[in-house]
Curated annotation (Swiss-Prot):
Family statement: Belongs to the dethiobiotin synthetase family.
Enzyme type, top EC level: ligase
Protein name: ATP-dependent dethiobiotin synthetase BioD
Function of the protein: Catalyzes a mechanistically unusual reaction, the ATP-dependent insertion of CO2 between the N7 and N8 nitrogen atoms of 7,8-diaminopelargonic acid (DAPA, also called 7,8-diammoniononanoate) to form a ureido ring.
Chain sites annotated for binding ATP: 13-18, 50, 115-118, 175-176
Pathway involvement of the protein, from the record: Cofactor biosynthesis; biotin biosynthesis; biotin from 7,8-diaminononanoate: step 1/2
GO MF annotation: an example: magnesium ion binding
Organism: Neisseria gonorrhoeae (strain ATCC 700825 / FA 1090)
Positions annotated as active site in the UniProt record: 38
GO biological process, any: biotin biosynthetic process
Coiled-coil ranges per UniProt: none
UniProt xrefs under HAMAP family: BioD (MF_00336)
Residues that bind substrate: 42
């Protein structure tokens, strides 16, 4: 595993932050030089909260790249979709700043895990969707899903749009932390999505994030 990977989810609050942190920790344990990035963080003032969570999970302090804001180039105060948060803060989202920051990280680290805001179709600006940015940068995607009710539908919709945009799915992370309380729903979701992944993206990896937080 080497290069820049975009971590997205089938929905908001699906466990992207924990999954990103755990994947980074696993790569560190394998001896990889790895960093995480949150290009757009909303609902914060000075520090991207998700980056702080990543570092805690990884077991490392805030890095020089964090202090330089390369890992958190755009922070908005209102907890909303990036396009709305930027508007409410009275300024635009600087895509060039984001691209440059990611490129600088990629030059310093073997692996860069870029955690997106929400799902693939979240608007970054009034005209640009998250998936447009992913396509433009040719990032492979790590998609986080779960066993909660509705996850099959949301995951398959994500599969459709990834195929439509010609984006490579590197892996599907099944997050047990957000499993349905109904064990039948959770297990069926796992079985169904595992089969669909093999059929739709045979080259993609299947990963599971246990309730303990281990990948």
């Amino acid at each position: 595993m080497k290069g820049v990977y975009f971590v997205s989810g089938i929905d908001t609050d699906i466990g992207k932050t924990v999954a990103t942190g755990m994947l980074a920790k696993q790569l560190l344990q394998q001896g990889k030089s790895v960093i995480t990035q949150k290009p757009v963080q909303t609902g914060c003032q000075d520090i991207a909260e998700d980056i702080a969570v990543h570092r805690k999970i990884m077991g490392i302090p805030m890095q020089e790249a964090d202090e330089q804001r390369l890992t958190m180039p755009e922070i908005f105060s209102h907890p909303a979709s990036p396009h709305l948060a930027a508007r409410l803060d009275g300024r635009g989202l600087d895509l060039d700043k984001i691209r440059t920051a990611t490129q600088e990280l990629a030059a310093q680290y073997e692996v860069v895990l870029v955690e997106g805001a929400g799902g693939l179709m979240v608007p970054l600006t009034e005209k640009l969707l998250t998936i447009d940015h992913i396509q433009q940068q040719a990032y492979p995607v790590i998609l986080v899903t779960s066993g909660r009710l509705g996850s099959i539908n949301h995951t398959l919709l994500s599969f459709v749009v990834l195929k439509q945009y010609g984006i490579r799915l590197h892996s599907l992370v099944f997050n047990h932390i957000h499993d349905s309380r109904d064990a039948h729903v959770a297990q069926d979701s796992l079985n169904y999505l595992q089969c669909r992944l093999k059929a739709d993206f045979p080259e993609a990896e299947w990963m599971e994030l246990a309730k303990t937080g281990a990948v």
